[in-house]
Amino acid sequence: MNGWPNRPVIYEINTAIWLGDLSRAAGRRVTLADVADSDWDAVTPPGVDAVWLMGVWERSPAGLALANANAGLQASFRDTLPDLRPEDVIGSPYCVRRYVADATFGGPEALAVARATLAARGIRLLLDYVPNHVAPDHPWVTSRPELFVQGDEHDLQAEPAGWLATGGHVLAHGRDPYFPAWPDVVQLDAFSPALRAATAETLADIASQCDGIRCDMAMLMINDVFAKTWGGRTGPAPDAEFWPAVLAGLRAEHADTVLIAEAYWDMEWELQQQGFNFCYDKRLYDRILEEDVSAVRGHLHADLSYQSRLLRFLENHDEPRVASRLPGDAERAAAVTIATLPGATLWHEGQFEGRRVHPPVFLSRRPDEPLDPELAAWYHQLLAVVAGQRVRTGEWRLLEASGWPDNQSCRNLIAWCWAGDDDRHVVVVNLSGQPAQGQIRLPWDNLPGRGWTLRDLLQQTTFDRDGGELADPGLFIDLAPWQCHLLALR
């Protein structure tokens, strides 16, 4: 389908768990080819532009065996599912044996049906790619050992947890610069021209099956990061960076494919320059969860060209459920924040319903939990309002709240506005557990000389203000803890 909007809203689904839930409810196996219309409706509410089917690729039997033998992982599985059964453990979706839709989910044909079903609804499909490593039983391990970081018997003896002997070669297990090796994957060589060519081919094949690709731990392939991780084992870094070299051909063949980088360590800007449309905004996530209003505000002072290519989120398959981290009103304030900022927005299946258990990605089943229909209705209202009222249209500006000598609670307010040809919106959030008051000067020159009606799109309240006062001293704000205004000016 492609034709992505500038500020897409993406809904992540753990494919294995979702289809497992649907299968149990239906009393039969449900694949991606026969998901009921009502179930697609539930994950594509108004305001969603794309669905990320996380974990559709063929999982590794070798990786599954390692997971079943790992006492620490098994303990984490039982913490999530006290009634754990052997069939609940299916292996990691990021231990990929082949980039072919798993037969458990219906295979490639079922994936194609799902994509067509979504496209008929105007919804794009996002899929995963893992550039750094593959499963130990991936065909490349035996057929193309030159694509991997290689060692020798001395390495294997000195650090057996970091290396794998296979087919007469010693290959490195996957890792990043800061943690021990991952025992269930084999490390690809980002400096290898052959690997870069093979990656380009794989990405092109994935792009033919979807509208966007989310690249796992994309910063690990940056030349400086890879050199730091492997300390010269792979020779000097090439002149060209990995991603520009790999993506040049993809862009020629699939120009509209949106590329999203999972990115940490302040590598977002660099990955944007190397060809990614959007990068994870982990800094904003951390600052919101830490309830650091000043840091959130400082983050939003970054250049708009940078912010417009960030992916904002409050949870995903790697992070704890936001309902387990923030109380209800605080979660809603945070949700309004990320839903109305520039850039892309990511929501996670189960987030709207208030799920609190964060299941490991190795599992195909999650525990039953009490769901929160009121919270789900509120989230659906938020998405529908932001999309239907064209809130994120036109020019975005960060606004400043001022206070008084004896009242500086304005420091807990964050605010911004959007102005399009026919739309003006102001967002004010009290991102704290205390009441906050302040005045916010609105930036539009034609405010004075007439009255304006301000309508809160979430609260369904209206009030009238003089345009001169809105310009100076500004819109007076008085918000209870964790409350917000999402205002339309008419």
Give the ranges of each region predicted by the language model:
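Active-site and adjacent substrate-binding regions of carbohydrate-active enzymes
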Residues: 1-490
